[in-house]
Regions:
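Short, surface-exposed coil-to-beta transition loops
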Residues: 60-62, 93-100
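A generic structural micro-feature
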Residues: 43, 72, 90-96
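A short hydrophobic beta-strand element
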Residues: 71-82
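Short, cysteine-centered beta-strand-loop-beta hairpins and adjacent loop/turn segments enriched
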Residues: 55-58, 82-94
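Hydrophobic pocket/interface hotspot
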Residues: 10, 22-23, 30, 45, ...
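Short beta-strand segments enriched in hydrophobic/aromatic residues
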Residues: 26, 80-82, 102, 116
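A solvent-exposed, acidic/Ser-Thr-rich amphipathic alpha-helical stretch
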Residues: 19-73
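Terminal "cap-and-tail" regions of soluble proteins that handle hydrophobic small molecules
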Residues: 1-15, 108-110, 116-155
C-alpha cells in the first residue's frame, strides 16, 4: 500500500473506532506517538483508540491533505476535529491542524509522530490559561530533550 492510502486507512480506522484496523497499518514493533496521550506500541493501539480517543471524544473528522512519501518516510498535513466528552468541555468542538510524520518499513508505519498546533483546539475546548501553560511546558520539555534541538539552544 502506498503512503497516501496507508495514512488514510490508519486515520479513518481511528475515526470509526476501529483500533485493530489502525494497528494493522503498523509494522511489528511500530509505535504511535500521540501528542496528548503518549506512546503506544502496535499491540496497544486498539486500547488507545477505545480507551482514550473514543472515551474522551466523539464525532471525529480527520482530513488528510498533501500526503507525500517514499519507502522510508511519509508526511501528511491534516485537520482533525471532534466533539469533547471530557468534564468541563462536554459537547464543545475542538479543531486542530498538524503534520503527521511516519517512518516506514515495507509499506507499514514503524513510527507515527506529529507536529500539531494544539493550543487552538484546546482553547476551543475552554481550557484555562494555567492548563494550557502546563501542556505547553510539557511540549517544551519534549522538544528541548531531543538531540537534534541541542545545537539550537546554545553553543
Amino acid at each position: 500500500m502506498d503512503f497516501c492510502d496507508l495514512i488514510e486507512t490508519m486515520t479513518q480506522a481511528i475515526v470509526r473506532g476501529d483500533g485493530d484496523g489502525a494497528a494493522a497499518c503498523f509494522a511489528d514493533g511500530g509505535i504511535y506517538h500521540d501528542v496528548f496521550y503518549g506512546a503506544f506500541p502496535k499491540a496497544e493501539i486498539p486500547r488507545m483508540v477505545s480507551d482514550y480517543f473514543h472515551r474522551d471524544a466523539e464525532r471525529f473528522r480527520w482530513d488528510i491533505h498533501d500526503p507525500v512519501g517514499n519507502a522510508e518516510v511519509g508526511y501528511a498535513r491534516y485537520v482533525f476535529s471532534y466533539d469533547a466528552k471530557i468534564a468541563g468541555s462536554e459537547g464543545k468542538r475542538a479543531v486542530f491542524e498538524g503534520v503527521a510524520v511516519c517512518r516506514l518499513k515495507e509499506g507499514l508505519i514503524t513510527s507515527y509522530t506529529e507536529v500539531a498546533n494544539t493550543s487552538t483546539g484546546l482553547q476551543l475546548l475552554g481550557f484555562s490559561t494555567e492548563r494550557l501553560a502546563r501542556i505547553v511546558g510539557r511540549q517544551i520539555d519534549e522538544l528541548t530533550a531531543r538531540d537534534e534541538v541541542a545545537k539550537h539552544l546554545g553553543p
